[in-house]
Amino acid sequence: MRQAGSEPGCATFRGLPALERRLACELAYLQLPAPRWTPVRDYEGRGVDDVAIVGAGMAGLALAAALIQRGIAVVVYDEAPAGAEGPWATTARMETLRSPKQLAGPALGIPSLTFRAWFEAQFGSAAWESLDKIPRLQWMDYLRWYRAVLALPVHNGHCVTDLQPQADGRVELQIEVAGRPMRAWARRVVLATGRAGLGGPAVPAFVASLPRARWAHSSDDDDYGLLAGLRVGVVGAGASAMDSAATALEEGAARVHLLVRRPDIPRVNKGKGATHPGFVQGYARLPDDWKWRIRHYINTQQVPPPRNSTQRVSRHPNAHFHLGVAIESVDERNGALLVRTSTGPIELDFLIVATGFAVDWRQRPMLRHLAPHIRLWKDRYRPPPGADDAELAESPDLGAAFEFQPRAGSHCPGLERVHCFCYPATLSLGVISGDIPAISDGALQLADRLAGLLYVEDIEHQFARIEAFAEPEIFGDEWVAEPLPPLTP
């Protein structure tokens, strides 16, 4: 069998309308989507959706498409305006995606739904061959097309402010729309809220007392043009640190100093050593010791920044890399920031902390009624000496359907009806709930699990459907009944 990516030449469709016709054919060949098979439910005169998804970024769209394929009624809520969901057109600052261009992403196994098909339909196969990596904003254009061509039911400008599971099989969603409250109900709710899905930026203590105008997190939606002429420090050496540093330099910062605690910048992305179907399908089946060992190892090795992102910084003569520099304190002095480090002080005008994200329930008021009851990995597992890891310890201990599970002794009926399809699911179930390489695997797995849960809950209804089914295969006129012949004497 020919390896993926080695094909001599795939068919190129002339324009998006032709591609969309081909996509419609592929879906028809696969008999997708399935007709709805779940019972219609209502509460207080309003419909109860089978599944409500919070977040219309890549993960939310992929899951919505997978659920619709399975004949499940779904609705998606996102607080962002249409076309601005996720980080791609807002807070992300990389020039191109870090993932290889050929990955299928959220295509769910459908060739005409891939980025490559979308790209070649518009620009041709020669342009595809010459493309190195996918431009960030072009990826967002693709996701907008993905949503439109599949007619996914996304409600923008809908900010979910509270989730309250009910004992009768519903989850109540409190939603704010244009400053006005509304309520909705669903049998299951899925959080597709991205990298910061159960919290927000991890903010180091040394900036906590500084005026907010003097520092930013790399995920903030700030105008870097305001950094023109300033001395800027960037804490960290990961991809987001490089993206922030490069953007500051391009916007005219006088100098940018990268302050890196480690004595060297990592060279190898160890996570790429597990990008194969065995890891995707097998990780969730591993015992706790192996899950912790794998994720802790990757955390301690850290992920290097992409080469092109690093060169985007280093090509500027006013970019300075300082390694082995741990920040001890930061104070305002004489209109500037005095940053004391393990190797000496430095004076800056502005500080950007590229310190990632953390599970922090205080930053997710939507989950305030659930957070005290959610079991975490620190409630489940004690790592061996030397393997403590705060990020892993705070991760939720999820079930096979990404569902939250209750802490021992807690009482929150319906908690298991809320599912965590975002980055903090990684320790429990693997890297299948947010990153491009395996997002289709995660979406399809979760859709299958949800379909199974809904069917089991509805077994009385489903059995009644079997009993009521009356479509004949034959009509009785295909034969003539006659008695057995007499025995021969």
Residue ranges and their predicted role:
Residues 92-125, 272-286:
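Flavin (FAD/FMN) cofactor-binding and adjacent substrate-gating region
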Residues 1-2, 109:
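Accessible peptide chain termini
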Residues 83-94:
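Core mature regions of organelle-targeted
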Residues 2-80, 85, 128-239, 243-251, ...:
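Flavin (primarily FAD) cofactor-binding/catalytic cores of flavoenzymes
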